[in-house]
Amino acid sequence: MPKIVLNGVTVDFPFQPYKCQQEYMTKVLECLQQKVNGILESHTGTGKTLCLLCTTLAWREHLRDGISARKIAERVQGELFPDRALSSWGNAAAAAAGDPIACYTDIPKIIYASRTHSQLTQVINELRNTSYRPKVCVLGSREQLCIHPEVKKQESNHIQIHLCRKKVASRSCHFYNNVEEKSLEQELASPILDIEDLVKSGSKHRVCPYYLSRNLKQQADIIFMPYNYLLDAKSRRAHNIDLKGTVVIFDEAHNVEKMCEESASFDLTPHDLASGLDIIDQVLEEQTKTAQQGEPHPEFSADSTSPGLNMELEDIAKLKMILLRLEGAIDAVELPGDDSGVTKPGSYIFELFAEAQITFQTKVCILDSLDQIIQHLAGRAGVFTNTAGLQKLADIIQIVFSVDPSEGGPGSLAGLGALQSYKVHIHPDAGHRQTAQRSDAWSTTAARKRGKVLSYWCFSPGLSMRELVRQGVRSLILTSGTLAPVSSFALEMQIPFPVCLENPHIIDKHQIWVGVVPRGPDGAQLSSAFDRRFSEECLSSLGKALGNTARVVPCGLLIFFPSYPVMEKSLEFWRARDLARKMEALKPLFVEPRSKGSFSETISAYYARVAAPGSTGATFLAVCRGKASEGLDFSDTNGRGVIVTGLPYPPRMDPRVVLKMQFLDEMKGQGGAGGQFLSGQEWYRQQASRAVNQAIGRVIRHRQDYGAVFLCDHRFAFADARAQLPSWVRPHVRVYDNFGHVIRDVAQFFRVAERTMPAPAPRATAPSVREGEDAVREVKSPGPLFSTRKAKSLDLHVPSLKQRSSGSAAAGDPESSLCVEYEQEPIPARQRPRGLLAALEHSEQQAGSPGEEQAHSCSTLFLLSAKRPAEEPRGGRKKIRLVSHPEEPVAGAQTDRAKLYMVAVKQELSQANFATFTQALQDYKGSDDFAALAACLGPLFAEDPKKHSLLQGFYQFVRPHHKQQFEEVCIQLTGRGCGYRPEHSIPRRQPAQPVLDPTGRTAPDPKLTLSKAAAQQLDPREHLNQGRPHLSPRPPPTGDPGSHPQWRSGVPRAGKQGQRAVSAYLADARRALGSAGCSQLLAALRAYKQDDDLDKVLAVLAALTTAKPEDFPLLHRFSMFVRPHHKQRFSQTCTDLTGRPYPGMERPGPQEESLVVPPVLTHGAPQPGPSRSEKPGKTQSKISSLLRQRPAGTVGAGSEDAGPSQSPGPPHGPAASEWGEPHGRDIAGQQAAGAPGGPLSAGCVCQGCGAEDVVPFQCPACDFQRCQACWQRHLQASRMCPACHTASRKQSVTQVFWPEPQ
């Protein structure tokens, strides 16, 4: 690894750093060496995490080496180097400069904080890639680290805390008891462990990971923890975090401002107080009964391991009185009549709490009493032991009285914190109506009446920052990829930052394209302003803009909306106007859910769709400041484009936003803290710009990445809005007046990037999408969970995920076809169907009634497989992996969906309600009583609108004969259905009914194989080939199949001639089978197109076409629809069903000549014509042998019914080409290439030249027939038919497969 010397410190870096990385590390060292704070912005992809780790650890090693050198010099007392002064050794100069690091224990610890544990895990993985091996510790909560079964099952975090404390105090947790003994083991203390590794190691060694991490913290060189452990004073005390002399690094620091304010704020609702009073009443009643009986409670007897509740009844009663007084004091506040609430200064909180006797003097006793009661009830089961209200009250008291009187007193707190940084806001309880609806006889009076919410909001993140500095932090480093503008960010923190850096990006200008799109394709202005964002004109123009952009952006596309309501409303509008279907036809849509549970499933499905072979990509719809806007991997193909649909300003009328702006304006006007405050309007604009910058940061993730950014709001055209963008983006921004120019430039950008940039390396951790449709089926996201929100339900937003037909979806929409000329690969306005299956669908759509809706709704689960035909490349054969049991993956997916649904239900319901739910499900399974099931589900899910989606998701468990009733129940309870369709009422595992032929007899089994004796029973006089050209040419012996046009996609080309072939086949099928039979055939063919199951379609085909020998040609001609990998099976099945050789089979070799003609063909009258023995060297097919034995003027010797009635049916139109080849090849070219002259490789004798085994061609105006060679001579000589002298061309003559007598 390269070693770089920066500011006198040798940094061991994994690779040669870029210039911007060296600049970044230099600034980090400057902060560390000078003991100052720094704000460092460096975009994701520039390696800032690696730079931070290597620089800080190299600096620590430099300090350690200096101390070691000084100690060595002291021991030898300068004897080794007598001419060198002792002060020049080690860190003596630093000590003289005021940096007294004289021993190893004085070397500062590094505290590395990020927002989530998943981000910390990524940092630890980066640390493993370096050469440094420091002692590492990761701090987490009991919820993440506890492995005790009883504690883990508790749903509430604070219950886990108190139950754990109870077990630790009583020494009843054997995992905790092993900590002191095993914490020094090499396997636990030495390796670099993240949060998951810590849990695994703790489980393996049966030692508590939570307390193990606290022990490791004492000796750790670098400690990883989430933000709130540092910013929240209560958490700092709980984890015993000593900040004196430490270096604190906040990674992803763009969230620090919000976290600082939220950690010092609270909202106390009437429900919190009411639930706390309920618990105190319960404890008071329990302790009163115990005291009256004169016996200790059995749970707290002397032989019990629990310490019990060490409180007098009088103390419990006083605590209840305090809560009642606090509730009364809040209710006594007068509010204006418009329910807008009232705002008080920060100091008012002390007056309010003083009325309830909560002061600096009493807070310790009150907190101790609350803690005892909560711990006393910890671990108890039941719905009436919810101690969340008491725990919240304890947290609130700690926030309000966070400064001890001895450290500054109430006066100083009011002057510094409350008066300047806080506001008290009291407003009516907005959730009262839902609470009142759910209230019952067990609810308290306080919960049933409308109360008031007490809000205590901190508006200065600098308060928490100043507290960290006051704790003695050596250096505070804030770093992120999106801190711009850095100057204003520093003002908000309210502490000095002498070191600032806005690093440029490491990419070149040809790797990024940024455009402001103020207008859509139709010229309408794009705006997310409050008064225009829901207008029909704006939503329609935005939808068209997104659809056109999706055409030119390859692979993954990210679309960010200002908020969830805007995203949901937009999708609802696009669905109603059919715009969503058009977008879905280009790239499947994935929508970011609100809930955390289903988000991982959604993003995994998106990754899998983008990575799927042959995929056209996917679109992910997300929200600014949402889960997808930070921390996720959208590098390379996962995110080639980012579209920002508007400026995500905070809600302007929200009380907290209004008060924040007022607070900033007041502080700026007063010149507080040296005037270092933003104005309210500046802060308001920066909230939107920072969210936009975070979304833009998704597109470029590393040095070789590239992508495009679309800013689709006219306000981005203003200079002040562009000035808020990151410094590395601003030079590339271009404002467009014409939407067509946007598409043109973007298409050119991606063409150049794909040629100049290296292809992304295969992802080792990419979603596991194996080749084939069965693998795609495994990564489908669970349908029920996706329907939990309108925004997540793609069935609602996208009514059809069906493959587009031959006509372009945008054919009738001029605006949406605007960008066709700018696409990378021009696509005609009306594409011809690729393949005969698509041609059949096109033919059926043209035959349907006008206005008939051809597209059907698909579930979200079907999303990943419904688009498969559209994704296949135009060249080359289709790759379809055969699955022996197609039902098994579907069943597995259904099982996975059911499990995920049960997890979601368990998260939403209480333990008692979940037990009721599971019991109802078991009863329904046993009794099939739908009425009882509906009566049970209603109270569980219908009362809370947030649980309506769970009721609708239960649809998957309802039996088919009850699904329609369940749909009615859902509509009655929630106002929305659950996606019922009539076909859902058909049992899925119902055994297939035997198909009857027109005579009423049971059709033969499609898998029937005929013996020789059975084959002899068939009538040999009926020729099989009474239809049109239908056999695929045999594949070329060598070369790439994709290089031969006639073999593209494995089936004959489905251009104009292919459509004629399909239309002719359908016409013949209707004549032969009738309307009912033809409908059955079409239904089976559509099913085959979707599920690729040949057996199903053969069962229907055999029942319809094998009852009468004259229908055999329909069976053989069906081969035009059979996919290449099924051709051989189909030909063998045709032979088995008819007892006759399939016309497309290969000719038998010389060893098989004796088996060419079945014995049944030899008895009867002798057949005229030359025998095979006359041409011993000639190999013939079975059909050829039959034709050779039949002269042109007979139907068959020995036939009792020979006559005109057995002549073939009416002639049909030409095949894919008049010559059996693609247009442009003449007859001579076919013969030279050795291509068969049509479906038959041998035929009758030409009446002109006497050539044998030829297929005749007939004049369209008369019955004149000749072979290919004769026709070519005639047409070259006169271009007229020799018989009728009608002008003819080689394209007009028609192949004749059963020649008429001449």
UniProtKB/Swiss-Prot annotation:
Interacts with TERF1. Interacts (via PIP-box) with PCNA; the interaction is direct and essential for suppressing telomere fragility. Interacts with MMS19; the interaction mediates the association of RTEL1 with the cytosolic iron-sulfur protein assembly (CIA) complex. It comes from Pongo abelii. Belongs to the helicase family. RAD3/XPD subfamily. One of its GO terms (biological process) is telomere maintenance. Gene3D superfamilies: 1.20.1160.20, P-loop containing nucleotide triphosphate hydrolases. The PIP-box (PCNA interacting peptide) motif mediates the interaction with PCNA and localization to replication foci. A probable ATP-dependent DNA helicase implicated in telomere-length regulation, DNA repair and the maintenance of genomic stability. Acts as an anti-recombinase to counteract toxic recombination and limit crossover during meiosis. Regulates meiotic recombination and crossover homeostasis by physically dissociating strand invasion events and thereby promotes noncrossover repair by meiotic synthesis dependent strand annealing (SDSA) as well as disassembly of D loop recombination intermediates. GO terms for cellular component: nucleus. Residues 1178-1187 have a biased composition (Polar residues). This is Regulator of telomere elongation helicase 1. SMART domains: DEXDc2, HELICc2. It is found in: Nucleus. PROSITE patterns: HELICASE_ATP_BIND_2 (PS51193). Residues 770-780 have a biased composition (Basic and acidic residues).
